[in-house]
């Protein structure tokens, strides 16, 4: 059985790590490299960095901090933010990132996924999906440019349809960001994640809602995701990564200790 992964998420804005609630009201948490080092030392399996305003502001991730992170940590990390071309992706990988993630640019041009996969291989192409539950229509919809609330917009995609499309285009992994749950620490959206799991043939990472160790156990046991991403519980010291892994191991969930 493949080990389940614990993945701290670092949202980056103007060179600092920030965290919001439901993608709004972001506050500064700390500096990029020290936080990355801390999580690597604490036993994280992987890190994800999102430059949250890059796509909305029509720019790309600052490569300088990508290279600094690569010099200081020895676990895989993924970067996202404004990557629209093969050349931009190549640069980030050359500076030390193990994977690149694409979200809003893929919604604008879905064929970008196929071009990236052809160039670099599916194993390092991650698609981030910002999914919002619309109670009025009882449906999950994909939103775009969510890093800047003034730029956020609806798309025509139902989440499940977009999950199917990005797999057809050749993505290697999907991060499902459940916007309604983000930062509120009330648990992952097991219903939505289970639905997506049933149509997702690539590794699926749950994002949004972690508040307790039990929430991690639930998302692995009930939704059968491959990895669980979280931010505020790690940034605020609510959950220690090694303690979390010991807890999960005691619950018979395969993790790397």
Swiss-Prot record:
Q: What is its EC number?
A: 4.3.2.10
Q: What is its main location?
A: cytoplasm
Q: Which reaction does it catalyse?
A: 5-[(5-phospho-1-deoxy-D-ribulos-1-ylimino)methylamino]-1-(5-phospho-beta-D-ribosyl)imidazole-4-carboxamide + L-glutamine = D-erythro-1-(imidazol-4-yl)glycerol 3-phosphate + 5-amino-1-(5-phospho-beta-D-ribosyl)imidazole-4-carboxamide + L-glutamate + H(+)
Q: Which SUPFAM superfamilies match?
A: Ribulose-phoshate binding barrel
- UniProt-annotated location(s): Cytoplasm
Q: Does the keyword Repeat apply?
A: no
Q: Which InterPro entries match?
A: Aldolase_TIM, His_biosynth, HisF, IGPS_HisA/HisF, RibuloseP-bd_barrel
Q: List this protein's GO terms for biological process.
A: L-histidine biosynthetic process
Q: Which terms in the GO cellular component ontology are assigned?
A: cytoplasm
| Top enzyme category | lyase
Q: Where's the active site on this chain?
A: 11, 130
Q: List the keywords (alphabetical).
A: Amino-acid biosynthesis, Cytoplasm, Histidine biosynthesis, Lyase
* This protein's pathway: Amino-acid biosynthesis; L-histidine biosynthesis; L-histidine from 5-phospho-alpha-D-ribose 1-diphosphate: step 5/9
Show the GO MF annotations.
Answer: imidazoleglycerol-phosphate synthase activity; lyase activity
Q: Which family does it belong to?
A: Belongs to the HisA/HisF family.
UniProt function note: IGPS catalyzes the conversion of PRFAR and glutamine to IGP, AICAR and glutamate. The HisF subunit catalyzes the cyclization activity that produces IGP and AICAR from PRFAR using the ammonia provided by the HisH subunit.
Q: How does it assemble?
A: Heterodimer of HisH and HisF.
- Quote the protein name from its UniProt record: Imidazole glycerol phosphate synthase subunit HisF
Query: Whose protein is this, by species?
Result: Shewanella pealeana (strain ATCC 700345 / ANG-SQ1)
């Amino acid at each position: 059985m493949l080990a389940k992964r614990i993945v701290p998420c670092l949202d980056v804005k103007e060179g600092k790590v920030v965290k919001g609630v439901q993608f709004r009201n972001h506050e500064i948490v700390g500096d990029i490299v020290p936080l990355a080092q801390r999580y690597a030392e604490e036993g994280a399996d992987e890190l994800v960095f999102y430059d949250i305003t890059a796509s909305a502001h029509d720019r790309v991730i600052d490569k300088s901090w990508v290279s600094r992170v690569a010099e200081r940590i020895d676990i895989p990390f993924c970067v996202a933010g404004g990557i629209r071309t093969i050349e931009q992706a190549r640069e980030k990988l050359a500076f030390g990132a193990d994977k690149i993630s694409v979200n809003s640019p893929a919604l604008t041009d879905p064929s970008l996924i196929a071009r990236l996969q052809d160039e670099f291989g599916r194993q390092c192409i991650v698609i981030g999906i910002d999914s919002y539950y619309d109670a009025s229509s009882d449906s999950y919809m994909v939103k775009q440019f969510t890093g800047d609330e003034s730029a956020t917009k609806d798309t025509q995609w139902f989440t499940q349809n977009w999950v199917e499309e990005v797999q057809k285009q050749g993505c290697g992994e999907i991060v499902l960001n459940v916007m309604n749950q983000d930062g509120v620490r009330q648990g992952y959206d097991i219903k939505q994640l289970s639905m997506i799991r049933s149509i997702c043939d690539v590794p699926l990472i749950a994002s949004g809602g972690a508040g307790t160790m039990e929430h991690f156990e639930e998302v692995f046991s009930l939704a059968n995701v491959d990895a669980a991403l979280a931010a505020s519980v790690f940034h605020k010291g609510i959950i220690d990564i090694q303690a979390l892994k010991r807890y999960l191991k005691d619950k018979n969930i395969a993790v790397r200790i």
